[in-house]
Design a protein with these regions (language model features):
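Phosphate-group recognition and catalysis centered on beta-loop-alpha active-site segments
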Residues: 17-371
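Sec-dependent signal peptide recognition
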Residues: 1-7
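Hydrophobic h-region of N-terminal signal peptides that target proteins for export
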Residues: 10-18
Length: 371
């Protein structure tokens, strides 16, 4: 865990704003999930409206082979399925990447069944305001998300990036009989998404990225945690992956690495060698995940004892920018853009309202969002 001390922040905080590199990417982690339930069209649209460069849908498969957006294939934490008596018999326990998980799983539902569910906030104790949207939004498909992106591109006149992650591809291939890499390439082609669009495809598993590298020209990102290793390569550790030799190997099939913040910043807030080592290998570095609440910040950046209170996320962003990362995944798109001083994307009024306890976009009506 990162444990920054206050003294380490002084030089970074001497100036209130940062000059943002125009190539620095703000990636909406599960959409604007700090303000709407994650992986809903409402979260993605809000992120786009707030200026995100990319939106990030995590993809799992339904029983009938449709990609839908959920952070994991167990859907009990983020939908109302537990309250739906007609699906009670679908509750089960599975071994997902070696871990026993009990709940309801996307691959056991048809798309028609999933369409009847509604999303809910994952962490209401930390983000209670998001819980007011519980029950409003359905689970979107990849096609729904692409249609939203195309509509917002037409509306705004700017290009909007897609940054999908294939979740648990080895498990889902065994469970569904569908190769997620092949299926994703076919789906993107069907939806007229090409490598000329703004697309990164990410995964923790190496085989699926290698397969995508052989099948397509899409940009690929190897996800890397601080510990453990890819489930498809038990003899390989993530620690080995972030060495110069490991990064050179990653560069044979991927264009970048998506890494935990702890792999970019040392305990005192100074940068590790990862960014420079990745650059030597020709890889971009996107760091995850920036969240504004104390519960997710290093102790030295927390303000008060309340985990739900907003801490000094701007200092964390300053450190990441100083470390030279090429972009960040964030739940909090507008605060991130404002803190980074992204003049191309931010709105001065919205940024001014960040210090006020009020919504910055109109509250949707239930009849507008419930299908």
């Amino acid at each position: 865990m990162l444990r920054f001390c206050a003294a380490a922040l002084l030089t970074l905080l001497a100036t209130p704003g940062m000059a943002l590199d125009e190539d620095f990417l703000v990636i909406a982690h599960r959409g604007a999930s700090g303000e709407r339930p994650e992986h809903t069209l409402a979260a993605y649209e809000r992120a786009i409206d707030q200026g995100a460069d990319y939106i990030e849908p995590d993809l799992v498969l339904t029983r009938d082979g449709v990609f839908v957006a959920r952070h994991e294939n167990e859907i009990g934490q983020t939908t109302d399925v537990a309250s739906r008596t007609e699906f009670a018999d679908k509750r089960t326990t599975k071994s997902i990447d070696g871990v026993a998980v009990t709940g309801w799983f996307a691959e056991d539902f048809t798309l028609a069944e999933l369409r009847t569910l509604r999303a809910k906030e994952r962490i209401p104790a930390i983000r209670p305001a998001n819980a007011r949207f519980d029950g409003l939004y359905p689970v979107p498909t990849l096609e729904d998300i692409v249609r939203l992106v195309r509509a917002k591109e037409a509306e705004t006149g700017r290009r909007i990036g897609l940054y999908p992650e294939l979740k648990h591809p080895s498990f889902l291939q065994r469970a569904t009989g569908i190769n997620p890499a092949d299926h994703l390439v076919r789906e993107l082609e069907r939806l007229e998404i090409t490598p000329q669009d703004l697309v990164f495809i990410q995964s923790f598993e190496t085989w699926v990225l290698g397969r995508l590298d052989r099948l397509s020209e899409f940009k690929l990102v190897q996800l890397i945690k601080p510990d453990g290793g890819p489930v498809d390569e038990p003899g390989v550790t993530y620690a080995e992956m972030v060495t110069p030799d490991g990064l050179a190997e990653v560069a044979t099939y991927a264009d970048g690495v998506g890494v935990n913040l702890a792999l970019v910043l040392q305990a005192d807030g100074s940068p590790t060698s990862l960014v420079s080592d990745a650059a030597q290998a020709g890889l971009v570095v996107h760091a995850w995940t920036v969240r504004k609440q104390n519960a997710f910040l290093p102790p030295g950046l927390r303000e008060g004892e309340d985990g739900a209170a907003v801490g000094n996320y701007a200092a964390l962003l300053a450190m990441l920018e100083s470390a030279g990362v090429d972009g960040v995944f964030t739940d909090d798109v507008l605060p991130t853009i404002c803190a980074l001083g992204d003049e191309a994307n931010n709105d001065d009024l919205w940024c001014a309202l960040l210090s006020r306890d009020q919504a910055r976009l109109p509250m949707p009506r239930a009849e507008d969002v419930v299908e």
